[in-house]
C-alpha cells in the first residue's frame, strides 16, 4: 500500500446453490488464498453465500437464518487476515428482504449496502423477492450484542490510509442511467466494488466490459467487478464469472469467462486522487454519507500491473498509426490557422537533418497542402556550422528537394567567427559561448529571412527538450510558431517513421529512415573523423527515460521515489538502478532550473495530455526551489 498502490482481487468460488454451509467453506478458502496473494480488497459475487439462483428459496426462513450464520462465520474468519472483504447475501430487516453486500474486516461486520436497482425484466425477477435499498442508514441487529449499519450511503474508509475510500454497488446498479457509484464517487469514494451475478448471452461481455471501463473513467476511480459463475443453477441461464479490475478507463485485469478465475491487480489510489485534483469540474458533494473505518497494514505492495516504459507511445501498431495521423493533423491545423491569421506568404524552417527539424518540415508541408499553397513558399534553410557532418547535411538537402521546398543554404561559419572576434571569444575554446553563439546566429538568419520574405519562422524544438531546457535561450528556443512544442522525443521518432511508411515516395522514405538512424545531436561541436561527436543522450541522458519521468511527474504528480520505483520495473533489463537514478536526478535538476526558458515559449499546438506552455498546462515560477524533490532523490538507493 506504500505510494498509493492497493492490491485488489475479484474472486468467484464454485458455490453450491442453497448450501450455505458448503459455500461458507468455499468462500473462506478463496478469501484465504487471495489474502495470501497480497490482496487487501477482496470482492466476491452477489448473493455468494446462498447462490444468486435460489429463486423462491430466498423466502424460506431457514435459508435466511443460515445465510446470516454463514456471514458471521466468514466475518470471524477474517479476524487474523489483513484485508477487507465484500460478500453478498440476502438479509432480512423489518419484515423486508434486501439483496446486500456485507463488508468484513478484522473479524467484524462493518456494514451492509443494499442493492438500489432490482431488475424485473426478461430473465430477471428480483423484485419478486427483494426490496429496493433505503436511502437512510439503519441499524441491523445480527445477534444479541451485534449490530451493523445498513444503507446506500455508506463508504468504507481505511484509517491507516485515509486516501482509500470504498463505495459499493451491486450488478444492475451499474447498468442504469444513474448508478449509485456516481454519488459514491462525488462523496469521496475512489474505489467502487461491484458484487454481480450477470448471466451470459452472446455479445454481453463486450458491453459489460465497456460499462466497467467507462464507469471507472467517468468517475476517476478504481472498479472491482466480481460476478457469479460455475456453480450457479443453469436452469434457464448460464453465469460466466466475468471478473474485471479497471482504473480510470484502463482494464488492469480480466478473467477468462467460464473459468471461475480469481484475478488480481493493484489500483493506484494516489494517481486517482491526483486526477481528481486536476479536474476541477469533478465537484465533491456532501450527501450525508456515513463513513465506516477499517484497518489495513501499510506494507510494500509487489506490483504485477504492467508499467509502460513508453507512456506517450501506443503499444499496438494500429493504435500508434492512428495516433500519429491524428497528431500530424493537429500540428498542421494549428499552423494552418496561424498562417491564415497572419497572412504570411511563406514559412521559414532551419533544417539540420535531425529528427525535430524533419518533423517540423513534414508538418509544414501538410499545412501547405491543406491551404493549397505551393511548397516553394516553404523556405527550408540549411546552415552548416562547425559541427555539421556530411550525413546530416546530405539528408537535409535530399529531404528538402524530395518535398519540393525552396532550398536555401547559408553557412554560419564566417558570421560566427566575426562575432567571436567582436566579443573576444577564442574559437578554440569549445564552451557554452561557442555552442550558443552558433544557435543564436542560426535563429537570427531565420528571423531575417522571414522578415525578408513576409514569412513565419517555424519552431522545431520538442517537448522533451523543453522539459530539460535543452535549447539555447533566444536561439533555437525562439520562433514564431512552435509546431513540436508538445510532442515528446519518443513520439517524434514514431511520427517520422509513420510519415516514411505512408508517404509513397521511395526516395523520401529512404532519407527519413536514415534520419531516424542518426544519433540525436545539436552538432555544435566539431565532428570526429567526420562523424557526430556531440551526442545529446550521452550528455543529458536517454530520452526514453526522461519522457517516462516527465509523464509521471507532470501528468500524474508522482514523487521522485514513486517514479524511481516504477522506472526500475519498466526498464528492468535495459538500465540498471544506478543509471535510472542518475538521470532522474538530472531530470529534476534541469526541470526546475530551466523553467525560465519555458516561461516565454512561443505559441504552439497542444497535442497530448502533457504540455509545458506557460499559457496552458504549466504555470510554474521560474525561481521555484527544487530542494524537497532533490532531498528525496538523495535518500534513494
Specify the residue positions occupied by each region the protein language model found:
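ATP/NTP-dependent adenylation/nucleotidyl-transfer catalytic domains that generate, transfer
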Residues: 7, 23, 160-164, 221, ...
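Enzyme catalytic cores with a strong preference for nitrogen-chemistry domains
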Residues: 1-350, 366-376
